[in-house]
Amino acid sequence: MDAKIKPLRAGKSADARTDFQPAELDPSEFLAAAVQPDQPRPSRAEAEAAVKTLLSYIGENTEREGLLDTPRRVVEAYDELFQGYHQCPAEVLDRTFGETAGYDDFVLVRDISFTSHCEHHVMPFYGKAHIAYTPVERVVGLSKLARLVEIFARRLQTQEHLTAQIAAAIDEVLKPRGVAVMIEAEHTCMSVRGIGKQGASTFTSRYTGMFRDNPAEQARFMSMIRNRG
């Protein structure tokens, strides 16, 4: 298959791209729970009724024995799969430790497994996240980075948005010298439905601070992710 390279838009030069800066996220996306206690929401009974409607839509008999409890089970599963809407990312990163003996290199946690759901088809995508940050005097507990991934993953997402949210939360709360996030994932909306290409992986990355400004640090981050020796 031949690739077609689109020309730059009129008035744009290739050099202009080097000045690109990523868009800033709204802090409400990563500093607080997505659902507030006083936010109006459908009742549990209404949610179960909606599941029953979908079962009827696909042609099922919702009164048969195997489906009698399915609406309840689906809503309970949603409560678990999407609990990230009720959790606060900033609180996870709030506790830090200052006993670092002057450590001044980046901290990397790789292979953080996760499962999320695509906001376009509500189908799972899953994979691994790799996170590095260069602390300023204080560090956060390593498990907190995994917990942060879990909170954002348990919401409807795109992989690009998930990557950006993780980086933005670390950058804003910890205020390190730089953050690097890479996510690799397989999307069932592409492998199970649609084009049906199993095994295809999608990679996304986001860099801030020293990682964004220094290609050598990006390269070292990537090397440490890939080096399994």
Curated annotation (Swiss-Prot):
Q: How does it assemble?
A: Toroid-shaped homodecamer, composed of two pentamers of five dimers.
Lineage, top-rank taxon, reads: Bacteria
InterPro entries named among the record's database cross-references: GTP-CH-I_C/QueF, GTP-CH-I_N, GTP_CycHdrlase_I, GTP_CycHdrlase_I_CS, GTP_CycHdrlase_I_dom
Q: Which PROSITE patterns match?
A: GTP_CYCLOHYDROL_1_1 (PS00859)
Q: List the top taxonomic levels of the source.
A: Bacteria, Pseudomonadati, Pseudomonadota, Alphaproteobacteria, Hyphomicrobiales
Indicate which residues the UniProt annotation says bind Zn(2+): 118, 121, 189
Any GO BP annotation: tetrahydrobiopterin biosynthetic process
Keywords of this protein's UniProt record, alphabetized? GTP-binding, Hydrolase, Metal-binding, Nucleotide-binding, One-carbon metabolism, Zinc
Q: What is its EC number?
A: 3.5.4.16
Report the pathway entry: Cofactor biosynthesis; 7,8-dihydroneopterin triphosphate biosynthesis; 7,8-dihydroneopterin triphosphate from GTP: step 1/1
Spell out the protein name for this chain: GTP cyclohydrolase 1
